[in-house]
UniProtKB/Swiss-Prot annotation:
Protein's UniProt name: Large ribosomal subunit protein uL30
GO molecular function: structural constituent of ribosome
HAMAP family in UniProt: Ribosomal_uL30_B
Record flagged with keyword Ribonucleoprotein: yes
Lineage of the species this protein comes from: Bacteria, Bacillati, Bacillota, Bacilli, Lactobacillales
CC per GO annotation: large ribosomal subunit
Recorded family membership: Belongs to the universal ribosomal protein uL30 family.
Length: 60
């Protein structure tokens, strides 16, 4: 299973507190910051809630 590269493309400022918490829990800080996370249900669930703020790519 491939990992996921998650890039924050929109700011979390002025978003719901739950969405800000998810962005922080994924390890994303500033706009254009990226992290590589395992492709599992927990990560997919977090991405579902902030899909409008991030860009997701599969990496090997």
């Amino acid at each position: 299973m491939a990992d996921l590269k998650i890039t924050l493309i929109k700011s979390a400022v002025h978003r719901l507190p739950k969405q800000r918490a998810i962005v922080k829990s994924l390890g994303l800080g500033r706009v254009s910051s990226s992290v590589v996370k395992p492709n599992n249900e927990a990560t997919r669930g977090a991405i579902f809630h902030i899909a409008h703020l991030v860009n997701v790519e599969e990496v090997k």
